[in-house]
Structures are given as structure tokens and as C-alpha cells.
Amino acid sequence: MVVVLDPGHNGGNAANPSVINKPVPAGRGATKPCNTTGTATNAGYGEHAFNWDVARRVGGELSAKGVRVVFTRDSDTGVGPCVDRRAALGNEAHADAVVSIHADGSEAAGAHGFHVTYSDPPLNSAQGQPSYMLAQALRDGLRKAGFGVSNYLGSDGLAPRSDLAGLNLSTRPAALVECGNMRDAGEAALMSTADGRQRYADAITAAILSYLGD
């Protein structure tokens, strides 16, 4: 089994706007900027760092179960890769599952909770039932671990979208997890601790293994 983990954004993005603002294919005939900086907690803990830490923890747990893990980036100090390249890495690895790890930055009053996104309407067979089942597994795993579903986006923890390049360009089962809202005080506090990030990682790992049939 092969799982591609895609920790969103990167630590060097903010200092390289000319690189990350370059338009790249986003699927459905659209383009998008190569990448973005991501959000942060009000105290300044960056989403890129959260994504990276959680992804590394998930990768370690999956590797211990015999899963081959591929990361779309190898540090939290680089730039990119662009969203189209991230999708290509999953395709090239013939991944059984591609999971993008993110956190949201909504400033809507009271906005909190996680949501999982998949490409809809699907552009290929992998984006159909396989990606939907992966998204469901991630939703169920996070909820089982005690995380609440989003009260501001999607329905029952699922938020299908048609505009995300990494999902649109994937030919493998793919889903994107927004673990919570970094602008919510409670979720920001959890994300800012190693114990909190381990909780997210454990839930995501269990969900992926469930999807893979382990």
C-alpha cells in the first residue's frame, strides 16, 4: 500500500511571492497560484508548521504498519511545491490514498470544527466513489477521536468542492482535511501543542488504515 501525505503550504512561501503567485493549472480549465502561505493562529503559529508536524506523525505511524509513505515536501523551510506538482506526485506514486493536511483560518464569529473536502463533481473514476469513501473515512475517524465537525462549512463534516487543484488533478483517491479553525481559541490551543497534534495524527492515521482495510 502507498499513501501520499500532502502537508499544505511551506515555511518558505511567504518570502517568495514571485514563485508562489505564478499561475498553474488547477483543473476544469482554470488556473490558480502555485501555492499560498496558509493561515496562522492569532498568536502566530503557522498553518504550514502544523500541517508539517501532523503529516510527519501520520507518516511515522503508517510506516510502522508497513505502509509506504510519500510526502509532497521534505521540510518546512522550502517553497512550494506548486499545487499541480503536489497532485502529480500522488499520481506518479500510484497512491492508494492521497491525504492533504491543512487547517482553516475563518474569522467568522464562532466558527470551529473540522471538515473534509473531495472533488465534486468528479473528473475521473478515482474522484468518484473512492475519494468520497476516503473523505468519509477521514470524517468518521476524526469524529470518533472526539473532534467536532465544522459548524460553518459543508454538511456533517464533508465539504465537496470543484475548485481545488490538488483534488481536481488527482487520478488517485484523494481528500483534503481541514483539521479545524486556527482562529478559534480552543482549536488554536490544541493545534499549538505537541499532544494536540498527536491527537490529530492518531485520528487521521486510524482513518487512513480503515480506508485501506487494515
Regions found by a protein language model. Give the residues of each.
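Alpha/beta-hydrolase fold active-site loops
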Residues: M1-V2, A174
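Active-site-proximal loop motif in hydrolases
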Residues: V2, P7-V54
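Active-site-proximal helix/loop segments of hydrolytic enzymes
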Residues: N42-D214
